[in-house]
Amino acid sequence: MHSHRQKWGRQTDIARVLDDIEHDLYLPQRLSLDGATGTDESHVQYGIVKDCSVLTCGCCISESLFNDLCRETSNKQTACPICQRENVRLLSAIKPLRDLARQIDFFRSTTGQGESESDELPAIVKTSPSSSSLSLTPSRSSSTAGLEADNKTLSDPTVKEKSSLLELFHIVASKMHNANTEVGSDHPLTTGTTRDQEEHTTKENYSSSLLEPNYDDHANWKILDNASNTRTVPIDNNFSLMSTDVTIPSTANYQTNSAHDLDEEKEYFFANCFPMYRKKFQFNTHPKFLGTKSKLFINQSISPDCTKFALITEHKWEIYSINPKDNSPQLVSCGKSSGEYGPNFNQLTEQSSSSLSTTSQASKKKKKNWSQRFCKLSNDFLIISGSQNILNVHDIHQNGKLIYTYVSRFPIRCIDIDPRSQIIAYGITGKDRHTGAEQALVVIQQITRNKVTLEPEFPPPITITLPYRDPINTIQLSHDAKYLTCSTALESRFLIISLQKINEPRLIMKSVRSIDTSLESEGITDTKLFPGNPNLMCITSTAFNSSPLVINTKITQINGVRTVAQPSMLIRVDEIGCKIHKCEISPRNDAIAFLDRNGSVYIMCAPTMMDNNEKRRTILVETVANAYRAYESATLRFNPEGNKLYILDRKGTFFVEDFAYGLPQSREITKCKQIFHK
């Protein structure tokens, strides 16, 4: 009778501990209909989630619940049931929490079986190296004397069961950071230690498992401990970011070249260096000899994945690849404005007229005499525009072959292409046929793929008429190509157009900035939406007393089709002056790079970018070639991980600022100049 009471008490203790741990899995689980109100409205019901996943907003819910929400809002933007953020997507499954749920269920089912044999010590073994389930098997003793000694030591049966439970969840915690750890069947439980010693041993074993993380499934295992070091929005890409609060071993322990290990090491270096310390790289694509004058390029661009960059002159263009190991550039393709292309200028191929897709019958005289002025580079295409109202599209996977030419009836003032190479946007200034009055127009050119040949196709463009006669000065597509930002030249207006329904573009935000309109003023020079967070936007300008601004666009708060949002200012960056040509937003959304007229490159970093009074830092990173006009200025680009800043100026000099190269005390790491700290 007494043994039955002990058994019942042990099972009660185990069940209580399991319930406490399982409470962490109490998350949004499913949709249920509310019949009490008389309507078929559904609401989210919480429960124990066994298919836990994380959304792009950072909240954790059930994967089946998210699929139900997507079916409920098929024609609308799916909102997070926890934070109510709209247009969220499923980022990844949280494998450790799913394994924990399965192991809790398994341990509940095997608790009664493990209690039946009181004369044998239960040992936890792994059934197979690839299986994540755990089983309890009796560990055989070689002598009865050993069993008697063990039974004397385990006079308190509660200690025995709790030591087994601690060991079980020690393995679960270690499995989160070490999937290849093998726990053999000859690993008996420590039975003669006190509870404090067991907890101390468990902490030591857990900390040691953090030192050498080895992951067996690199394709599916996604670390979600530190998706971003900012509270604005998580990083939306395929690169895993490791937590920076773990102990990182020396470089000698990273000989396996594991991608996750390297990412963890870089994250540790980045956390210690950014934004004050970096490794500086500099390369000249066209070196000078004997003091000759350096070659100047009209425009340049860096691809969104930071694997290529392009340089153009009036009649030539060049594309370079970036070596991921040493960041050195190498020429991969080049060509001329006449249509010739090839791997180098000594092996150019004539463009055949039959393979060229065009939307208008341009004269041969126009094509031969035109000069290039603007260029943009995506991951797949290089687009170039210039005089004679010509826009060319080159396929960089075919040595820069010209695949599309568009000849507009009006001058093309600015161009852009989204990172996924699906939309080209450019601004033109049209004229009314009857009155001759100028009109600002935005043209959207879609790029589709043939379902059979997978060749790019260019359907008829979509023209958007702006409600202003002021010419368009800048145009910029958002990272996900759902929004288009543009600014005007004379009245310094800036607008946001929604492209979520590409055939029905809609103006969702408009405002004007009161700045100087003298001859030296260039007005608004750049407008950038934050990646993954369209509520934040950075605006730069070159005019008297017009410092860069970070504004709240409020476009996710508008209701109704005809509603237009009115933005509000969040941060005014006065410390870097008022002659800023360009800006670039870090994918981490906690830093902005600025380029002024003199060629100085600054980085302003702040935790949230939501308050002008919050702590922020501004540092001088680099000095590149100056530019009197904004279209001649250098190009800035953060890599997808946000730990490198790439800079390409009009002299063809390529700079790389690597903030994750090493620790600040390393010889190759240099310190930046801090100009502002708040």
Curated annotation (Swiss-Prot):
Changing residue 435 to K: In PTR3-17; constitutively active, confers increased STP1 processing in the absence of amino acids. It comes from the Eukaryota. Component of the SPS-sensor system, which regulates the expression of several amino acid-metabolizing enzymes and amino acid- and peptide-permeases in response to extracellular amino acid levels by controlling the activity of two transcription factors, STP1 and STP2. Residues 179-194 have a biased composition (Polar residues). Residues 127-144 have a biased composition (Low complexity). This is SPS-sensor component PTR3. Residues 111-158, 179-211 are annotated as: Disordered. GO terms for biological process: response to amino acid. SUPFAM superfamilies: Tricorn protease domain 2. Homodimer. Component of the plasma membrane SPS (SSY1-PTR3-SSY5) amino acid sensor complex. Interacts directly with SSY1 and SSY5. It comes from Saccharomyces cerevisiae (strain ATCC 204508 / S288c). It is a peripheral membrane protein.
